[in-house]
A protein has these predicted regions:
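Pre-active-site segment of Zn-dependent metallo-hydrolases
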Residues: 1-20, 26-36, 123-136, 171
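Core dinuclear metal-dependent hydrolase active-site scaffold
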Residues: 1-6, 70-136, 220-225
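Active-site neighborhood of phospho(di)ester-bond hydrolases with catalytic His/Asp-centered motifs
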Residues: 11-24, 28, 44-46, 115-119, ...
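Short, well-ordered alpha-helix to beta-strand connector turns
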Residues: 12, 40, 65-67, 139-141, ...
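Short glycine-/acidic-enriched loop or helix-start segments at secondary-structure transitions
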Residues: 26-28, 54-55, 99, 125-126, ...
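Active-site neighborhood of divalent metal-dependent phosphoester bond hydrolases
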Residues: 35-40, 48-72, 194-196
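Active-site regions of enzymes building and remodeling cell-envelope glycoconjugates
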Residues: 67-70, 86, 210-215
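Cap/insert and terminal regions of metallo-dependent hydrolase folds
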Residues: 112, 120-220
Length: 225
């Protein structure tokens, strides 16, 4: 990998971790001795997330072998990066068994983005942390939001209240009465494999599109300049 990318393993200069659920940190294993063997790659993490990585294998080996260097994050404190980019974490309510969960605001001199792939509910974000979804989206140019489930009909035989995520139908209701310019910022991400909105031909996808929202797709690129 290093040779094919001119000595820059993976072409990555840093990674920001939202939380310790499988799809959000497991990829760190590929930075290790058996794979990319990166050297002191910057990994930005909140305090509990950092403790989890340092004290649990195989992640601890990444630290011991200096494949990664963990840099601390703090809630609502900007981190200044090169190129005029800065990142701010916002703690959000989620099933925090092993770590905190955060969203990230990413900002350049020209544009800003909210990246929020996992949250229990928008109401809990307001009641527990004082953040309004509408206000946070109003402050950015693009918003990538948790869209794990379209509605409550996706997991037959399971109590979906035990898997809290704002359903897409609920999130659309939050924005439906706002100007088109606000709805146009919203991209739904993090769709579960059961989510019918994954398919262009589904009624769910059609409903989302007709109401002025978008679903992010693999290989989409969004520039901050």
């Amino acid at each position: 990998i290093s040779t094919s990318l001119n000595g820059d393993p993976l072409g990555i200069s840093g990674i920001f971790i939202t939380h310790a659920h499988i799809g959000h940190y497991a990829g760190l294993m590929f930075l290790g001795h058996e794979s990319a063997a990166t050297k002191s790659l910057n990994v930005f993490a909140m305090p509990r997330m950092e403790k989890f990585l340092r004290n649990n294998g195989p992640w601890s080996q990444l630290v011991d072998y200096k494949n990664i260097e963990i840099l601390p994050l703090a809630d609502q404190v900007w981190v200044e990066l090169s190129g005029g980019i800065k990142v701010k974490p916002y703690q959000v309510p989620h099933r925090d068994e092993f770590s905190e969960t955060v969203a990230f605001e990413v900002k350049s001199s020209k544009k800003s983005v909210l990246f929020l792939p996992d949250i229990d509910s928008w109401a809990k974000w307001k009641s527990e942390y004082g953040h309004s979804l509408q206000e946070r989206v109003a402050a950015v140019d693009l918003a990538f939001l948790d869209a794990t489930f379209f509605d409550n009909n996706e997991l037959p035989g399971r109590d979906m209240s035990e898997i809290p995520h704002p359903r897409i139908v609920e999130t659309m209701e939050v924005f439906d009465n706002l100007p088109e310019s606000e709805k146009d910022k919203v991209y739904f991400i993090h769709l579960n494999h059961t989510n019918p909105a994954r398919f262009f031909t589904s009624s769910a996808y059609k409903d989302i599109s007709e109401r002025g929202y978008k679903i992010a797709n693999s290989n989409d690129r969004f520039c901050l300049d």
